[in-house]
Amino acid sequence: YFFPLFLVTIFLYKWLVKKTPSKNLPPSPPRLPIIGNLHQIGPDPQISLRDLAREYGPVMHLKFGSVPVLVVSSADGAREIFKTHDLVFADRPYSSVANRIFYNGRDMVFARYTEYWRQVKSTCVTQLLSVKRVQSFHNVREEEVALLLDNIENSKSKVINLSEMLIELTGNVVCRAALGSGYNVDSYKSLLLQIMDMLGYSRSIEDFFPSLGWVDWITGLKGKVEKAANGVDAFLEGVLKNHTNPSTSSANKDFVSILLEIQEADAGSSMDKECIKSLIWDMLGAGTETIATALEWTIGALIKSPDAMSKLQKEVREIGKGKSRIEEGDLVKMDYLKAVMKESMRLYFTAPLLVPREARQDVKFMGYDIKSGTQVLINAWAIARDPSSWDNPEEFRPERFLNSPIDYKGFNYEYIPFGAGRRGCPGIQFAISVNELVVANVVNKFNFELPDGKRLEEMDMTASTGITFHKKS
């Protein structure tokens, strides 16, 4: 008699304690049992979260399965994350797909915040992606842009698939910088596209229900990830095995050569074979598709905005007058080009939710109590379209950036296309150097029109979802 009563008492106590909020959490939309708020996230998560934020506020507390999620949709909230509490929110949440692809978290993008990550980040920033190193690849960029122009020239009487041409260009630029000669984007493009799709948000059941990881085997995701991971490893193993380039000058060394030299110089460093493989795949993945997608959005926006296209062509053609190709030295004079690139990155994010972060400890955030282990989503897309920060935010208007101090380097929190803080993208200079050169040369040499008599208002500037967002057409 007493034992069952004791069990009931314990159960009621735990139930009541669990039901009684002991923390001051941000506002939250109503949840369903087990799945939490997952049912409220549509195919375009950034739009779903923006719409929820309009009703519940720019700081929300959601549950994705069993995972607590802090969603931030304002510049003030982003400033708190990236500046005030950057170290607290410097971790990454577990991703079953990324963990398998990147050798149990040995890369830079998805790795947890540890001393290992700090060493790897320092190596990438100082040795691979410094301004000097990026400038050393200017010949690669100019050669690949020349090939792009030739390909468009040879196809100019036909309807062209610019998306395919852009991913080939960016892939070859990144590939030559990372791997050197002997490789091109076709060496890894199929694998890359598979993995980028699998890394898209909410693909894995295990990430939201850790005890249900077996479901990903049933759905086939685990099998696909295993096959892709084995393909990546075989490709990268071949790269390392065949990579000998002793005659290359130090100024023009590719990324693999640099990392192998670091490994040889310090056998006790973190730079082992799996680390090198992970970093190289980071560079190939983060560089190829994201840069191509940004270019696709920019050219699409210019075609849809004839006035902006006309102004840009006027600037580029005046500065490049008499030249068959725009050179990198010409770009510094092109203020409207830089404004176009900034405006395109404001409206059309390749990663609109940024890469998720995770709280490393309990923290007081904007008056709310956030527990350690809470995942953090920054809706950078919504922040960049916030009417409290931008006039007519839905309009493509490059003029807003002329004579404006706002930049993409992570210090203006209303505009964070590359993120900010410790986990901000270190490849900004690499990406911008490709983007500006391509756009300047393409609009200098060609005029564009939509196929089959399509009207501008029929042009689809919405997105399809993966880890990066592409135009649907």
From Swiss-Prot:
Enzymatic class: oxidoreductase
Biotechnological utility: Psoralen possesses photocarcinogen properties. It intercalates in double-stranded DNA and cross-links pyrimidine bases under UV-A irradiation. Psoralen is widely used in combination with UV-A radiation to treat a variety of skin disorders like psoriasis or eczema.
Keyword check for Membrane: yes
Sequence intervals crossing the membrane: 1-17
Region listing for Substrate specificity, in residue ranges: 350-355
Organism from which the protein derives: Pastinaca sativa
EC numbers, comma separated: 1.14.14.141
Family under the similarity heading: Belongs to the cytochrome P450 family.
Keyword Transcription regulation: no
Keywords: Endoplasmic reticulum, Heme, Iron, Membrane, Metal-binding, Microsome, Monooxygenase, Oxidoreductase, Transmembrane, Transmembrane helix
Superkingdom as given in the UniProt entry: Eukaryota
Gene3D superfamilies for this protein: Cytochrome P450
InterPro entries from the UniProt entry: Cyt_P450 (IPR001128), Cyt_P450_CS (IPR017972), Cyt_P450_E_grp-I (IPR002401), Cyt_P450_sf (IPR036396)
The organism's taxonomic lineage, starting at the top: Eukaryota, Viridiplantae, Streptophyta, Embryophyta, Tracheophyta
Pathway named in the protein's UniProt entry: Secondary metabolite biosynthesis
Function field: Involved in the biosynthesis of coumarins and furanocoumarins (FCs), natural products required for defense responses against attacks by predators with potential medical and agroindustrial usages such as anticoagulant, rodenticide and artificial vanilla substitutes. Involved in linear furanocumarin (psoralen) biosynthesis. Converts marmesin to psoralen and, with much lower affinity, 5-hydroxymarmesin to bergaptol.
Subcellular location: Microsome membrane
Induction: Accumulates in roots after wounding.
Assigned GO CC terms: endoplasmic reticulum; membrane
Summary of pH dependence: Optimum pH is 7.5.
CDD domains: CYP71-like
Identification of the protein by name: Psoralen synthase
